[in-house]
Amino acid sequence: MTSTLPFVSVIIPVYNEAENIQKCLNAVTSQTYPKSKYEVLVVDNGSQDGTKEIARQFSTAYDNLEILIEDEQQGSYAARNTGIEQSSGAILAFLDGDCSPHQQWLERGVSTISGTGVDLVGGNVEFTYPNGGTAAERYDSFTNMQMKESISKRNVAKTVNLFVRQDVVEDVGPFPNHLISGGDVHWTKRATDAGYSLTFAHDVIGCHPARPFGELLKKQFRVGKGQIQVWMLDRISLRRVFALALWILVGFLPKPPHYLSQDLRRTGQTVTKAMFVRILVVAWCCRLAENAGRLSYILRSEEQ
């Protein structure tokens, strides 16, 4: 049976992930999928916190794990592209360095993509609460990386936990190297627009730590900058400029409470009234940070 299994390349871009990479690689190297049938490509993007050294310990212990370097361009998409260039698998499994997959992650991901004939599989992201479930962690857990929602409503996915056939990557092309954020959504949209099929697999699970408040604000600022980058990829028209201006104006307003209530119900979470108020404040701060990212990129572009 092993001889008929497809070879898989697990691609993990990392940048200053010393806090999480050991847990991630422990999980990736302990899969039920035969070790002779997969390789792990850790692509370091200029880490300065010991991430590379931790990964090297694993490459010494495991023949199927290799460290690659992408130091010409900063960005996770550039790192993923480097991994793609060096990969040998018929299936590519993208994973973030702070995401720790369940032991049957590879086996179930390959089974889904091979058994159903689909081209892309987005896995489930389960959140953990390193700080006990603060308002910021709660908000992150029901708003970010909602793979089922992204796939069912928008037909796009994130690379935090994504399986793709290698021939799809060959046809669609590489990730946009220059994007700060949103490159995975942009890329998967290109793939599905080209006719490739994408499905969600609830049992292909990766565990991700929910972000604390400061990290969440940094992420949303980066997301805002990436949104403008993606917006600028399409032809600019007066109608689109007007829509962008309205988008930015609305971005200064608090998120309506009923939307947050819907998100909580969708993910099966219940919180106290006091926690809900704190989540509302976090949501507004994140919205402002995202808007600041948009304006920052627009103003920077005007200066160049």
From Swiss-Prot:
Q: Name one GO molecular function term.
A: glycosyltransferase activity
Going by the entry's taxonomy, the superkingdom of the source organism is recorded as Archaea
| SUPFAM superfamilies referenced in this protein's UniProt entry, alphabetically | Nucleotide-diphospho-sugar transferases
Compartments where located: Cell membrane
Q: Which protein is depicted?
A: Glycosyltransferase AglE
In the Enzyme Commission scheme, what number(s) does this protein have? 2.4.1.-
Question: What are the annotated disulfide bridges?
Answer: none
Chain's role? Involved in the assembly of a N-linked pentasaccharide that decorates the S-layer glycoprotein and flagellins. Catalyzes the addition to the dolichol phosphate carrier of the hexuronic acid found at position 4 of the pentasaccharide.
Keywords, A to Z, come to: Cell membrane, Glycosyltransferase, Membrane, Transferase
Where this protein primarily resides, as one coarse class?
membrane
Q: Family, per the entry?
A: Belongs to the glycosyltransferase 2 family.
The record's annotation in Pfam families points to: Glycos_transf_2
What is the protein's species of origin?
Haloferax volcanii (strain ATCC 29605 / DSM 3757 / JCM 8879 / NBRC 14742 / NCIMB 2012 / VKM B-1768 / DS2) (Halobacterium volcanii)
Q: Which GO terms describe its biological process?
A: S-layer organization
So, what pathway does this thing act in? Cell surface structure biogenesis; S-layer biogenesis
Keyword Cell membrane recorded: yes
Gene Ontology CC, one term: plasma membrane
**Phenotype seen when the gene is deleted:** Mutants contain only mono-, di- and trisaccharide-modified phosphodolichols. Deletion does not alter cell growth or stability of the S-layer. Mutants exhibit defective or limited motility.
